[in-house]
Design a protein with these regions (language model features):
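Short, acidic, metal-binding catalytic loop of nucleotide-sugar glycosyltransferases
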Residues: 22-32
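Non-catalytic, C-terminal membrane-associated alpha-helical segments of glycosyltransferases
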Residues: 229-233, 247-305
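N-proximal low-complexity "stem/linker" segments adjacent to membrane-targeting elements
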Residues: 1-24
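Short aromatic/hydrophobic "clamp" motif used to bind/position activated sugar donors
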Residues: 86
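A short, conserved alpha-helix in the catalytic core of glycosyltransferases
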Residues: 160-163, 167-171, 178-211
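Glycine-rich, basic loop-to-helix element that forms the pyrophosphate-binding segment
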Residues: 64-81
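Conserved donor NDP-sugar-binding/catalytic core segment of glycosyltransferases
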Residues: 98-130
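Short, flexible, basic/aromatic active-site loop/helix in glycosyltransferases
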Residues: 134-154
Length: 305
């Protein structure tokens, strides 16, 4: 089974991190891997990548004429892949050496049409003590209560997800209006795609936590204002997904909210009462504030969608 790993990049200041991502893919224990790199409308960056890697036999390089965003960039990559499976990783991530091998194990051991793994944090400037693990998803890291091994979920994170190539092609790829592009705030492009996949095939993404990818959490991603803004637009995006795809598109978020309020919050309160701690208190406060902020974004989405 051949795997095509797609890396999209667009900012020159991220070049060192892009190199880390690229080398982590090159260091995989699984051999049958090709790499497709898409530079999103940055000619200077494209020339730099071409100068350093243009002659690499395992790498195909493409540059978009304009900055079209992550979703459209990944769609453009589909024109160049030749593998049976397309695996996606971001330019600020580092794959464990067994990442591809563990994804392939899912396809070879099950009838999965999509597979994804666990995102682990690489705290660039230290772990923020106020951020509860239940909300690690805001910084692109697998959170407490996500899923059990082998469970079929709607989607894993966009930097650790894969699809059978024919499935991606039959779905016409990602919705280009959703996902990162400059300051655009409609997030979660993998959510929209996987919601359509569930409607079309009745299937989700098989979760294998042993397929690990580390995500670099830069200092600015742990800034409280940034986190609250991201939480707001995540809530907005969940409502947008319901409108764009179906009312069931945010079912997993509803189930997580129930688990959060009925299991995790009571557990945290008990722990705080029995063993008082300032970090525990800060995390509990942040948990409530983020939950309310996401709800506010969702309500705003109701007005817009």
């Amino acid at each position: 089974m051949k795997v095509s790993v797609v890396i999209c990049t667009y900012a020159e200041e991220m070049y060192g991190h892009f190199e880390d991502a690229l080398e982590s893919v090159r260091g995989q224990t699984y051999d049958d891997v090709e790499i497709v790199v898409v530079v999103d409308g940055n000619e200077d960056l494209y020339e730099r990548v071409r100068s350093d890697h243009g002659g690499d036999e395992d790498l195909t390089l493409h540059c978009n004429e304009d900055n079209v965003g992550l979703s459209a960039s990944r769609n453009n990559a589909l024109e160049f892949v030749t593998g049976d499976v397309v695996a996606l990783i971001d330019d600020d991530a580092v794959a464990d050496e067994r990442w591809v091998e563990e994804l392939v194990a899912v396809y070879e051991g099950t009838d999965a049409i999509a597979a994804g793994g666990r995102m682990t944090p690489i705290w660039v400037d230290g772990r923020p003590g106020f951020l509860p693990e239940e909300f690690y998803w805001l910084v692109g890291v697998t959170h407490r209560g996500f899923a059990d091994p082998g469970e079929e979920v709607r989607n894993t994170f966009g930097s650790n997800i894969s699809f059978r190539t024919e499935v991606l092609e039959e779905l016409d790829g990602f919705e280009a209006e959703v996902g990162r592009q400059g300051e655009k705030n409609l997030q979660a492009h993998e959510t929209e795609l996987c919601a359509r996949m569930r409607e079309e095939y009745g299937r989700g993404v098989v979760y294998n936590p042993d397929a690990e990818v580390g995500h670099k959490v830069f200092e600015w991603r742990t800034d409280k204002q940034w986190l609250f803004e991201r939480a707001f637009w995540q809530g907005y995006s969940k409502r947008a997904m319901e409108s764009l795809v179906s009312a069931d598109a945010s079912q997993e978020e509803s189930e997580f909210l129930e688990q959060l309020l009925t299991e995790f919050v009571p557990s945290r309160v008990r722990s705080l009462v029995t063993e008082p701690d300032t970090e525990k208190a800060a995390q509990l406060v942040t948990l409530f504030v983020l939950t309310g902020t996401i709800g506010s974004g969702y309500l705003y989405g109701l007005l817009e969608w």
